[in-house]
Regions:
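Asp-box/WD-like beta-propeller blade repeats and closely related beta-sheet repeat scaffolds
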Residues: 1-10
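Beta-propeller domain segments
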Residues: 4, 23-181
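Alpha/beta-hydrolase-fold catalytic nucleophile elbow
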Residues: 12, 20, 96
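S-adenosyl-L-methionine-dependent methyltransferase catalytic core, i.e., the SAM/SAH-binding region
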Residues: 17
Length: 181
């Protein structure tokens, strides 16, 4: 597929490397546990997989893949095109991603969480075919915020410091389509 690379990087306060990965404009990878596309990944700073990642069950000779071929670096799945990743002052990890037609999302990332794409979205396919909303499938993690119309997010950060005290702790999202922060 073309596009939807995602691939944003951030180190958290504990030194773990977090990587977002887009679905490459294909529908199956985001739910395929034998692919690291459409996922949020977590690695140690040396590139190894943390032993407490949710899907770790490694073979010694293949440290990234377990007995049934699941990638151990996967932290969460069901992402379409995550283009911003940031840690808040409480240590929680957040991802902002472009949905399909409308349905851009701000997600609080949970260990082993499945965010549902392409099974659910608060947007529709570009050819206007509907995608079931998150509310129809409570087994998937719903976004904390979704945007209709889309904002086409490109970055996410949390305000720190004292220069903008009134905004301290708030998230700022850059919107390509909306041309706003």
């Amino acid at each position: 597929g073309y596009g939807h690379y995602g691939h944003r990087l951030v180190f958290d306060d504990e030194g773990y490397l977090w990587i977002t990965s887009g679905d490459r404009q294909k529908f199956t990878p985001a739910q395929d546990m034998q692919s690291n596309l459409g996922k949020v990944l977590r690695l140690n700073d040396d590139g190894s997989v943390p032993s407490d990642n949710p899907f770790v069950d490694h073979f010694a000779d293949s440290p990234l893949v377990d007995r049934i071929g699941v990638y151990g670096e996967v932290w969460s799945l069901g992402h379409r095109n995550p283009l911003g990743i940031a840690q808040d002052s409480q240590g929680s990890l957040w991802v902002i991603e472009m949905g399909p037609r409308h349905g851009d999302e701000l997600n609080l990332i949970r260990k082993g969480g499945n965010y549902g794409y392409p099974e659910v979205s608060d947007g529709d396919h570009y050819d206007r075919r509907p995608i079931p909303d998150h509310i129809t499938r409570p087994d998937f993690e719903a976004p904390k915020i979704s945007w209709v119309p889309a904002i086409s997010p490109s970055h996410l950060s949390f305000v720190e410091g004292t220069q903008f005290e009134a905004w301290r702790g708030n998230a700022l999202a850059a919107g390509l389509g909306a041309k706003v922060i």
